Amino acid sequence: MDPNGEHSPLGFLPCYKPPGATSRDLVNRAQRRLRGEFGLRKLKVGHTGTLDPLAEGLVLLAIGSAARLTPWVLQHGKRYLADFRLGVSSESGDLESELVTQTDVKLPTAAEIEQVLKDFHGVVEQTPPAHSAIKVDGERAHKRARRGEDFEMPKRRILIDSVKLISYEPPMMRLDVRCGSGTYLRTLGMDVAAACGCAAVMTKLIRNEVGRFTLDDTLDCAFMFDDDDREKMSSEPMVKYLRPAIEGLTHMPAMNLDRQQIGMLQAGIRISGTPEAPSEPLPEAWIGCIDQVDTFDRNTDVLDCIGVDRSDGSSGPWGELVAILRPHGKLWHPLRVFPTTESITLRG
């Protein structure tokens, strides 16, 4: 609850992050604005996956208690459009560092690129770039890289659902990528180029999808980073773009709950029941690979389900989120519980 005794909001806010802005800055600015819209002194806001400053596109913000759902939202795949320039390299793998042109290098044909892309599917081993937010020995890698330190980045396994060559006008290559959390698109493009016998840097990156959320759903937050537009757009309420928290969990099995079960869960008591199949399940191939990927925890993958209240039909087609449930023998344990009175009316 907020300090005035009102219930806090709960949901996901799909935002468009402009290039040049950090995801943390987007969170901070959205938090200040939403506190004003809700009349709250405190409001938890987080993101469900960062975007590099030079990238743009969809950043899904978790509002209020929805931040507790991040491990399950991260199970969703993401979709990107990524542009690369072949035949050049940079220390950071993008335009943030000075470009070095390769000499005496023959650029690949489109057919050669498409042949190489066949090897980048399913579980793939990847070495993240040194200019990244990954911590190495307790410190962000990009800070150590900018100090000129020599260190080794740990390899990790990532999941690529599909990667397609959308256009190729040498030296520019555009890829359409569907992948799991933890994938570095800079590294993917550099690895594809290396397999073709050349170097590459990423020149543009757009995140188009996170699960069922798309760029078309987003609030364009560019105005929050432009002093000239900030006042002009101040009448546009951010809350109208807030989506029910359950929309980030439609890939999970769902159990319909009655009033007695809801009361038991809110008291921390395990319940019995049988969940329904997910309304928007993850692809079978995705589920088969998901526990092989370093960024996923099998305990929070396909084993859990959501408990929902569909008693009055006022919470949209999925119902109102009550709890995240984890199997415990023949019963279901309330891992995360959300009092139904905590939810606010959101657009369906």
Curated annotation (Swiss-Prot):
Gene3D superfamilies: Pseudouridine synthase. The keyword Transcription does not apply. SUPFAM superfamilies: Pseudouridine synthase (SSF55120). The active site is at 52 (nucleophile). The keyword Metal-binding does not apply. Keywords: Isomerase, tRNA processing. Responsible for synthesis of pseudouridine from uracil-55 in the psi GC loop of transfer RNAs. PANTHER family: PSEUDOURIDYLATE SYNTHASE TRUB1, TRNA-PSEUDOURIDINE SYNTHASE. This is tRNA pseudouridine synthase B. It comes from Rhodopirellula baltica (strain DSM 10527 / NCIMB 13988 / SH1). The gene is truB.
